[in-house]
Swiss-Prot record:
InterPro entries: Alpha/beta_knot_MTases (IPR029028), ARM-type_fold (IPR016024), Prob_MeTrfase_TARBP1 (IPR025806), SpoU_MeTrfase (IPR001537), TARBP1_dom (IPR056921), Trm3/TARBP1 (IPR045330), Trm3/TARBP1_C (IPR044748), tRNA_m1G_MTases_N (IPR029026)
Gene designation: Tarbp1
UniProt EC number: 2.1.1.34
Similarity comment text for this entry: Belongs to the class IV-like SAM-binding methyltransferase superfamily. RNA methyltransferase TrmH family.
N-acetylmethionine PTM sites in chain numbering: M1
Keywords, alphabetical: Acetylation, Methyltransferase, RNA-binding, S-adenosyl-L-methionine, Transferase
Sites where the protein binds S-adenosyl-L-homocysteine: V1501, G1524, I1544, Q1546, L1553
SUPFAM superfamilies listed in its UniProt record: alpha/beta knot (SSF75217), ARM repeat (SSF48371)
Name of the featured protein: tRNA (guanosine(18)-2'-O)-methyltransferase TARBP1
PANTHER family to which the protein is assigned, alphabetical: METHYLTRANSFERASE TARBP1-RELATED (PTHR12029:SF11), RNA METHYLTRANSFERASE (PTHR12029)
Annotated organism of origin: Mus musculus
Length: 1579
């Protein structure tokens, strides 16, 4: 058409030049530019290019087209059309006007680069340049184009027009472009896309099937292949990856067409080439690259169900890549790693996990030859992929606390891979791996499993000093913020790694000790653990082989551990002469190191002398401690001992006492700790006298000395604790210093009150004295034996009580400028100078210590605190006798004290508030508010939050406060309820908050319950909602939170084999411990006690209301949702409470219980309801009439829940046990069962048959003669159930329901225990593993004592040994992949109509065919299977399409979809005229096999490597069309059942159609071929 128009214009014009001039005139527009292009192109085709026309073309180019290109730069909607037309017209002008115009325009454009018009000009004229004459210009053009493309910010026209034009240019331009590309240097990560853009544009010239010089053959260039690999594996955008695949595919195609051997030079002489071709192995090579490209294309789909079936092809690639003859690589392994890189980079984390697992499993099948590229891949991209925590989640079906499948595979892979590495490369590989762990911040879970994998590597000499340093870096850099238990376990594994992999000949004992110091002793390296013993044994075996230590002597013993430790202690204790005397304390790290090595050396010696004399161990310990004991013994007499030395000695003493006690569960002092404690006690008198002198003789005069004060008080506390442990006797060395210390401190404080202008030294002494008194008060509180009997105690108490509260220490002015301190590494509390902040810490310490003393006094003399002002006694203890002022002072001090100093204030308030609750309610409420505000602000501060929260709970929820508040029912009562709700709300975000609250309240109520007073427990009823919330507490955690909990449970299950379990105390902050605490508390209450009974009944009513409100809630209710879990916990608790219910109480709640049976519940809840009804009817048969009445409601109302009551009826033998006259009950049971055996609902009939069989068996057992007339009917019904249900799955279902645990094994009385309620029944009924509470969890929770009756805990039947059955587990049972060996049954608890479980029966088909014949419809033999489709809109549309085109049957996953409004809206009643059959997804395998046996061809609508084109496919008459799921398509196991896959030809970019549209296209094509007779033979 365009040619005709151009010819018409040229015919009408006499001169072409005039026509061109006319077209160039007027307003520039896209239409005018396109018309000009048409005319010029037609003139060029005619070959007219001389004379006037050439001149006219030159003028058009110069005067019109070039300005037009520049003018269109401004934009506008028509700009692209103008650019395209003008560029094409300009190219024609250049050809018409001659080569001079092209050269001139090209030179001008090169000067104007990188503007868009210049790019358009070059794209237009580049193909017009001549090779020999314009070679320099062509080379300039080639280089400029490539540089512009690689710059990254080039105009879009570079890739769209300039580079394709360059490909059409002469060879000099191509060669210059290739040289520019090759000399660009190593490509950065962001340069891969631009490079591939250039290569794709030049591919026809660089990868051509014509003979070309080798330097222009991209296949021979290593840089080309590395760029392609980067695009395949690392490119983020799909277009770049597509270009890389295109280049690879073209290179392979060109190699096959040329049929010439070639090879890209290898990167090294040992490995294979990046690319090579051999004509002899053409078929093998083509197959390899076809599979490779196919895999890379499949990975673009990003869908696991599409990709997983292709992974076996990846295995085949590895098999082809390794020579079977010599075991070396044929193909460069970097090609295989590109596939894994692509999988690791996928947005689909499931796909990334599959990629990681596939790589880790490689060495299970075949041992691959060593390759540096593979090692780099493991330490690079694989390590990056392994850093994702979500990869380590447990598989579906694995119990809680199971090992991570990926963690196990990683462990096995690392063991296998390192065992195959050459010895000379193993060290380098492991070092890089560990350094990679230290180079980045890892989450806790990956570090744990990587550390375990490293610890599993067999022992070898792989790591030297650098490796040990890398392990230290992992400990110190990557694990600071990890969860404590996970961090402790990882440290254990890293220590085992060091012991297995370190070459002891390359490291010294100093290196080892420095590494051990980086382990946290309070988390991993505790004495007495299995790990400690393993470390000692390793040191024993290797101590003679360590490299010489810098501390060693020259006598040949430098490598001995004993010699090293002896020198270490000597060097530590003595004060170095070169070290200046400083006012600051030394760092604690050296003391930690020395104490650790002393204890290790002693235990190593113990292993050596295990079967010899034990005295040697004590002698070795004495040798180590001699320098220390000698120095300690001189402390009390040598006044000139350097301060630094005394500090070090006392630090070492503290660390030794802290570390020497074994950390085994229930461990007591062993001979080492006993000997060590005895040795230290021998110097106790000297040490205690030294401490007394330093604390009382004004020797501590500087702010920095306050750190020393803390050290001295810690030493004194340790000595007191040790003396009490050994036996506190009058006149012992410790007791002799306590009274002088107390008196001196009081004297100093009294003197300080009288001074007008205090100096720094006096103020420091004042702080020291108060700190000493606080330490003594805490010691007496902890060890009552220290309480002095002397009359001197009362004056001290009176003095402390008379001190002004919250007195702020005056900042000393005279010395403040001259005092300053420098920061210490150990983060001392007093390390700042006397700035406001620095002195503020001193004041805070003083106030804290004062409130410690006051807290001690108030608890000691709590009986003296008056409740009202009229009760005040004569002033003995002023503070105790003025509680209002004391409480107000407490509120004041809370506003100034830091979070770490408020504990004693809370303890004081705990004593004061109960006394003032009646008279000063407003002040008490204010104290609650202030305290809660502080606690809520600390929720992100781990170190201070938990101790403060515990003190807060003890204060606000004190039993006396709760009792008084409940009695008054005033504002305090409602404030407590408000705080209670806020704490429960906080606990949903921060696990463990509710645990502390419920534990404290239950413990205090149990103490009250065991008291003599009858009313002491009565107030608990007023707070029963707290127990209610505890019984149903527990949130649904995010996936990452569940992963952390799973891994923590896994570590706990390791037991004492993991040292972290022994050392780290389990805080029991998990949510299920809240429920355990509440349940154990309820189990301990006595139903015969009136107050207990009232409490339990009130709780039961609240539980039933909770269940009812949950049922009415509009929250989405599905299996294991929060609503399901709450209802589940409600009925579990009601079962626990049942023994306390009497008949009168049950009269009030029985209707609610029966009503709950009519509610649509999950299976687990129905079991609990049924169980409770059985127990009620068993204990109180008087409620049987109400039970029979439940069967009398209209069928429409109860058809979905009548199965609940039929299940109860099936346990008739339990119900009638306490009924003397059983005949009427049995008769009624048979009547009801027979009635419901006639129900139209298949599920109801099955339940009724079970109940009938059980009742009839009971009648025969009891020889109930009055039912003899029913024998024939009942026996016939039961016989039919056994034998006549042979068609379809009915017989299987009848057998399954009889074998179901609730009807076969479960015994309502013998199984009535905590184990069944909280573990066995949830497990058997499909509740998530997070809800299973094993019996050992109850036993481990010792804060609440267990019930004396052990039978209440353990089940008496074999119920716990069963596995979940199909009847209740249809939605979680066997997967599609297992359907051929285990079919599934519908969950009758979910209101599913199960008649469609059986295959399509012939009578049903005939019925629909007969109806269709009467209506004149044409019936095909096409079956459409839509069981995998989820959305009702798609199902409704398919139903309508199938009915319109006369399909035989539409198979759906559940006939419930028919009642969905969305389905009905799209089906427009088509379901009434089309046979619908229910086949659940788990039954599809059997259904497809059955239909294949009947002669059907199973056709899948799926894109696969061997799919048939729909346009070419001929449908058989008996066709079964299987449609895939909306998201996942057809599962891989079902694809194997397909006879053929048909795909719809597509022209667009989007890779898939809506499933309804796809199905409709195939249904129409079948109808067109089979029924309309329009089929054409395939071409």
């Amino acid at each position: 058409m365009e040619r005709v128009l151009a010819d018409a214009l040229l015919t009408q014009s006499r001169e072409p030049g005039e026509l061109l001039g006319a077209l160039c005139g007027g307003e520039a527009s896209a239409e005018r530019a396109e018309t000009l292009r048409l005319v010029l192109q037609r003139l060029e085709e005619r070959g007219a290019g001389a004379g006037a026309l050439a001149k006219a073309a030159h003028e058009v180019a110069r005067d019109h087209l070039v300005p037009l290109l520049h003018a269109s730069q401004g934009g506008g909607p028509a700009r692209p059309r103008v650019l395209r037309a003008a560029s094409a017209a300009l190219r024609s002008c250049a050809r018409l006007a001659g080569p001079e115009l092209a050269v001139t325009l090209a030179e001008e454009a090169l000067r104007e680069l990188p503007s868009a018009p210049a790019v358009e000009l070059l794209a237009a004229v580049a193909p017009c340049l001549r090779a020999p004459e314009d070679a320099p210009l062509l080379r300039r053009l080639g280089r400029a184009s490539v540089e512009l493309a690689l710059a990254g910010d080039a105009p879009p026209a570079v890739g769209a027009r300039l580079l394709p034009a360059l490909a059409q240019s002469a060879e000099p331009a191509l060669r210059a472009a290739w040289d520019a590309l090759s000399s660009a240097g190593p490509g950065a990560e962001g340069s891969t896309g631009p490079e591939l853009l250039v290569l794709s544009a030049l591919a026809e010239k660089l990868l051509t099937n014509h003979e070309r010089h080798g330097d222009l053959d991209a296949r021979l260039c290593g840089r080309f292949w590395r760029t392609v690999q980067a695009g395949l594996g690392r490119a983020q955008d799909g277009l770049t990856r597509k270009r890389a695949r295109y280049l690879l595919q073209r290179a392979v195609q060109v190699s096959a067409e040329l049929a010439v051997d070639c090879s890209c030079s290898p990167q090294d002489t040992k490995g294979p080439s990046l690319f090579w071709w051999s004509e002899k192995r053409k078929d093998e090579l083509l197959k390899f690259w076809e599979n490779y490209i196919l895999i890379m294309e499949i990975l673009e789909g990003n869908q696991i169900h599409v990709i997983k079936p292709a992974l076996p092809k990846l295995n085949r690639l590895f098999e082809c890549a390794v020579s079977e003859e010599n075991g070396c690589w044929l193909f460069h392994p970097s090609w295989h790693t590109c596939i894994y890189k692509r999988m690791f980079e996928s947005e689909n984390k499931i796909l990334a996990k599959e990629g990681v697992i596939h790589f880790l499993e490689l060495y299970d099948v075949k041992s691959l030859p060593y390759s540096p590229e593979l090692s780099e891949f493991i330490t690079g991209p694989l390590m990056d992929a392994l850093s994702e925590s979500c990869l380590y989640s447990r598989s579906p079906g694995q119990p809680l606390g199971s090992d991570s499948p990926l963690g196990l595979k990683l462990q096995k892979f690392l063991v296998t891979y390192t065992s195959l590495l050459p010895e000379e490369t193993k060290s380098c590989f492991l070092l890089k791996l560990i350094q990679r762990m230290a180079d980045r911040h890892w989450c806790a879970v990956p570090v744990l499993f990587l550390s375990r994998a490293l610890a599993s590597i067999p022992s070898c000499k792989a790591l030297g000093g650098e490796g040990l340093l890398a392990l230290r870096d992992v400990l110190q850099r990557t694990m600071i913020t990890h969860q404590v238990l996970l961090r402790g376990a990882a440290q254990c594994y890293l220590l085992q790694t060091a012991m297995r992999l370190v070459d002891v000949e390359k490291v010294s004992l100093s290196d080892i000790s420095a590494f051990l110091l980086s382990l946290r002793q309070e988390e991993s390296l505790g004495r007495g653990t299995v790990l400690w013993t393993e470390l000692c044994d390793w040191l024993r075996v290797n101590e003679r082989y360590f490299k010489q230590s810098s501390l060693g002597g020259s006598d040949g013993q430098e490598a001995s551990l004993n010699a090293y430790v002896k020198n270490l202690v000597q060097e530590f204790v003595k004060s170095p002469g070169w070290e200046k005397e400083s006012s600051f304390m030394p760092d604690w790290l050296d003391a930690r190191l020395t104490a650790l090595m002393v204890l290790l050396a002693v235990d190593v010696e113990g292993l050596k002398t295990k079967f010899r004399e034990k005295q040697r161990t004590q002698n070795v310990l004495r040798i180590f401690l001699d320098p220390l004991l000698d120095a300690l013994g001189k402390l009390g007499t040598n006044a000139y001992m350097p301060l630094l030395r005394t500090d070090r000695c006392l630090q070492l003493l503290v660390r030794l006492l802290h570390s020497c006690v074994p950390r085994r569960p229930g461990a007591q002092d062993d001979e080492v700790s006993t000997a060590l404690q005895g040795s230290i006690m021998s110097a106790s008198e000297s040490v205690s006298q030294f401490v007394l002198r330093r604390l009382t003789m004004n020797e501590l005069q500087d702010v920095a000395d306050l750190d020393r004060c803390q050290l001295y008080l810690t030493v004194l506390s340790e000595l007191m604790s040790l003396q009490v442990k050994l036996g506190w006797k009058a006149g012992n060395p410790i007791s002799r210093v306590l009274s002088p210390l107390k008196n001196a401190c009081v004297r100093h404080l009294q003197e300080a009150e009288d001074r007008q202008e205090p100096t720094l030294s006096h103020q420091v002494q004042r702080v020291v004295s108060m700190a000493a008194l606080a330490a003594l008060c805490e010691a007496v509180d902890q060890y009552p034996v220290l309480q002095p009997d002397s009359p001197n105690a009362e004056p001290v108490d009176r003095f402390l009580s008379a001190l002004p509260l919250n007195h702020v220490l005056q900042k000393p002015r005279s010395e403040e400028q001259s005092i300053g301190v420098c920061p210490l590494e150990n983060g001392s509390v007093f390390e700042e100078s006397l700035s406001s902040k620095g002195w503020g810490k001193v004041v805070a310490q003083y106030l804290h210590d004062q409130w410690v003393c006051l807290s001690f006094l108030l608890r000691k003399h709590h009986h003296l605190i008056p409740s009202t002002e009229s009760d005040v006694l004569e002033g003995f203890l002023p503070t105790a006798e003025t509680p209002v002022q004391a409480l107000q002072a407490a509120l004041d001090v809370l506003t100034v004290l830091p979070a770490g100093r408020i504990l004693p204030v809370f303890r004081c308030m705990e004593v004061l508030v109960p006394k003032l609750l009646t008279s000063e309610e407003t002040l008490c409420i204010e104290s609650f508010d202030v305290a809660w505000k502080i606690i809520s602000s600390l929720s992100n501060t781990q170190l201070t939050f938990w101790p403060n929260l515990k003190a807060f709970v003890h204060f606000v929820f004190d039993h006396e406060i709760l009792t008084i508040a409940a009695k008054l029912k005033g504002q305090v009562y409602f404030k407590i309820k408000e705080i209670m709700c806020k704490m429960i709300e906080m606990s949903s975000i921060k696990s463990g908050v509710f645990n502390i609250l419920i534990r404290h309240c239950c413990q205090s109520w149990l103490v009250a319950a065991s008291g003599v007073s009858q009313g002491s427990f009565s107030s608990a009823k007023d707070y029963s909602e707290l127990v209610l919330e505890a019984c149903v507490f527990g949130t649904v955690f995010r996936r990452d939170q569940r992963l952390i909990q799973d891994v923590q449970t896994f570590i706990e299950n390791l037991g004492q084999g993991c040292a972290a379990n022994v050392i780290i105390e389990n805080a029991k902050r998990e949510d299920y411990y809240v429920r355990i605490c509440a349940i154990k508390f309820l189990c301990l209450l006595d139903g015969s006690d009136v107050s207990h009974k009232l409490f339990l009944e009130a709780l039961a009513i609240k539980l039933l209301d909770k269940d009812e409100s949950a049922s009415r809630s509009r929250t989405r209710y599905h299996e294991n949702s929060l609503q399901h879990r709450v209802k589940n916990r409600v009925w579990q608790t009601l079962l626990v409470l049942f023994p306390a219910f009497d008949q009168n109480f049950l009269h009030g709640i029985i209707d609610k219980v029966f009503h709950a049976g009519f509610t649509n519940n999950q299976a687990s809840i129905k079991y609990f309801i049924e169980w409770l009804i059985i127990l009620i009817l068993h204990k109180f048969p008087e409620f049987l009439p109400k039970f029979w009445a439940c069967f009398s409601y209209g069928e429409e109302k109860i058809k979905a829940s009548i199965c609940t009551f039929l299940s109860v009826l099936s346990h008739l033998d339990i119900i009638v046990q306490n009924i003397p006259e059983k005949k009427l009950v049995l008769k009624q049971a048979l009547t009801v069962a027979l009635q419901w055996c006639l129900s139209h609902n298949f599920s109801v009939r099955l339940y009724a048959l079970v109940a009938l069989k059980k009742a009839w068996h009971l009648c025969k057992t009891l020889q109930f003669e009055e039912c003899g007339a029913w024998t024939a009917v009942i026996e016939c019904s039961l016989s039919q159930a056994e034998s006549m249900h042979g068609a379809g799955n009915a017989r299987k279902n009848w057998q399954r329901i009889q074998d179901h645990f609730f009807f076969s094994t479960f015994h309502p009385l013998k199984d009535y225990c905590l184990e069944t309620i909280f573990y066995t029944l949830p497990r058997l009924s499909g509740v998530t593993g997070e809800e299973w509470i094993a019996l050992d969890k109850f036993a481990n929770f010792t804060d609440i004592p267990s019930n004396a009756g052990s039978q209440w805990y353990l089940s008496g039947t074999a119920l716990g040994e069963l596995s979940p059955g199909d009847w209740s587990q249809q939605d979680q049972g066997s997967t599609l992949g297992e359907a051929d060996s285990q079919s599934e049954w519908a969950d009758v608890q979910k209101k599913i109509i199960p008649w469609g479980q059986s295959a399509l029966e012939s009578d049903l088909e005939l019925e629909f065919q007969d109806r269709a014949a009467k209506l004149g419809k044409s019936i095909s033999r096409l079956i459409v299977v839509a069981s995998l489709i989820d959305k009702p809109t798609n199902l409704g549309g398919l139903c309508r399409t199938c009915e319109v085109f006369g399909a035989a049957v539409l198979v759906v996953g559940s006939l419930q979809c028919v009642s969905d409004r969305q389905f009905q809206h799209l089906s427009v009643s088509a379901e009434q005229w089309l046979p619908l059959v229910e086949v659940r997804p788990s039954q599809l395998m059997n259904y497809l096999q059955q239909k294949k046996a009947e002669g059907y061809t199973v056709i899948g609508v799926e894109q696969t490597a061997q799919s048939s084109d729909l346009a070419q496919y001929r449908f058989p008459e008996k066709s079964l069309l299987l449609l895939g799921n909306e998201r996942e398509g057809i599962p891989a196991n079902l694809i194997q059942q397909l006879d053929v896959c048909v795909e719809i030809p597509q022209q667009g970019i989007i890779r898939s159609l809506n499933v309804h549209v796809s199905g409709a296209l195939l249904i129409w094509e079948y109808t067109r071929q089979q029924l309309l007779g329009c089929a054409e033979p395939p071409s």
